[in-house]
Amino acid sequence: MFKGFQKPKRLVANTETLTERYGMFTAQPFQRGFGTTIGNSLRRVLLSSIEGAAITAVRIEGVEHEFSPIPGVVEDATDIILNLKQIPFKISSDGIKTVRLSVDSHGDVRSGQIETDADVEVLDRDVHVATVSEGGKLNIEMRLKSGRGYVSADKNFDEDLALGYIPIDSVHSPVRKVNFAVEAARLGQMTDYDKLTLEVWTNGAVSPQDSIGYAAKLLKDHMTIFINFEEVPEQTEEISERGMDKMNEVLNRSVEELELSVRSYNCLKNANIQSIGELVQKTEAEMLRTKNFGRKSLNEIKEILANMGLSLGMRIDQHGRLVAPPPSAGGGPDFGPEDDGQDQIGE
C-alpha cells in the first residue's frame, strides 16, 4: 500500500550554528504536502507540550498581595513577579522545589543571587529581579514545579500553599520559539518533493535536538491508536529496499564528487551530465558515443560506480527511485541485481 512513498532517511543539523539554545535542522525528501504537515505538527507540539520548570507561587516578605509596594525597593510586587517569570530554571527531580532570594544591601538584584539546592539550576543568572534602595532589604521564597505549557494562577493554587504565598500564572515550556519553512526538493529527475527546515530556540533546559525528539515521540505515541492493522514488512524483489535506499542517497550528488580524472570529468561536463543520477541512466554504448570518451574513461567510471553500489544502465522510476536495470540492449552489459559491477565487456 505504501510502496514508493518517499520518506526522509535522517534529520540533518546545521553544526555551524548549533548551540545549547538554538538549532537549525533539515529533512528531505518528503512527498509533496508532508513537509508542511510534519513541520506544523512538530511546531505546535514543541511550543505547547515539552515539559519544563517554572515558578508557580511567590512569597515576598512584607507583601500581602501582588499590588503591594515594598519598603526600600524601587519595584512593587507586580514588577518583581513579572521579572521572576523571565528566569529559566531546570529541575532534575520530581515534586515541588523551594528556592530563596535574600538581599540586605542596596543595589541591583539579579537571578544569580537565588539560593538553590543540587536539584535546581538557574539557567540565566543575569535576569534583573529588583533594585534595593539604601537601607532596604528583599526576601523572596519561590515554589518551582515541572509542567507543560501555560498554567493559570488559579490552577497553581494548592490547598497546602503556605500563608503569604501568591500563586502566579506560569509558562513551563522550555521551547521559546519555533520556525519552519518548506521548499522544493529534488530527487533524481523529480523536483516535486518537499524539503523541511526547522529552527528551534530553547531556554537551555533542553537542547534543540532533544526537544524535537520529545515532540516526535509524543506525536508517534498519539498516532499509534489509529493504526488498525498489523504492519507487513515490504517484500524485496530484484534489489532489496535497504540497498535501494542507500543508492538513492547519492543520486543528487554532483559528478564532481566522483574524483574522476580531468579527461573523464571534462567528457561528462561536455555531455551535460551533472549528477550521479543522470550518469547511471546512461548505457555503455551511449557513453562511448560521447566525444573524446574512450574505453579507459569508461572503465574508470564503471569502477568508481561499482564501489558505490551503482552501475551504468540503471533506471529511475517516476518517484526518483532506482530500480533494477533491464536486460542490456545495443551492446551494453547486463548488470543484474547480484552483479558485482566489474567490467564484463569482451574485447
Curated annotation (Swiss-Prot):
* Assembly and binders: Homodimer. The RNAP catalytic core consists of 2 alpha, 1 beta, 1 beta' and 1 omega subunit. When a sigma factor is associated with the core the holoenzyme is formed, which can initiate transcription.
**For this protein, what reaction is catalysed?**
RNA(n) + a ribonucleoside 5'-triphosphate = RNA(n+1) + diphosphate
The family database entries (NCBIfam families) matched by this protein are listed as: PRK05182.1-2, PRK05182.2-5, rpoA
UniProt entry keywords in alphabetical sequence: DNA-directed RNA polymerase, Nucleotidyltransferase, Transcription, Transferase
Stored SUPFAM superfamilies: C-terminal domain of RNA polymerase alpha subunit, Insert subdomain of RNA polymerase alpha subunit, RBP11-like subunits of RNA polymerase
Annotated GO molecular function terms are:
DNA binding; DNA-directed RNA polymerase activity; protein dimerization activity
Q: Domain of life, per the record?
A: Bacteria
One Pfam family, short name please?
Answer: RNA_pol_L
Q: What is known of its domains?
A: The N-terminal domain is essential for RNAP assembly and basal transcription, whereas the C-terminal domain is involved in interaction with transcriptional regulators and with upstream promoter elements.
Annotated region (Alpha C-terminal domain (alpha-CTD)), positions in chain? 247-347
Q: What is its EC number?
A: 2.7.7.6
Gene symbol of the encoding locus: rpoA
What the protein does comes down to: DNA-dependent RNA polymerase catalyzes the transcription of DNA into RNA using the four ribonucleoside triphosphates as substrates.
Q: What is this protein called?
A: DNA-directed RNA polymerase subunit alpha
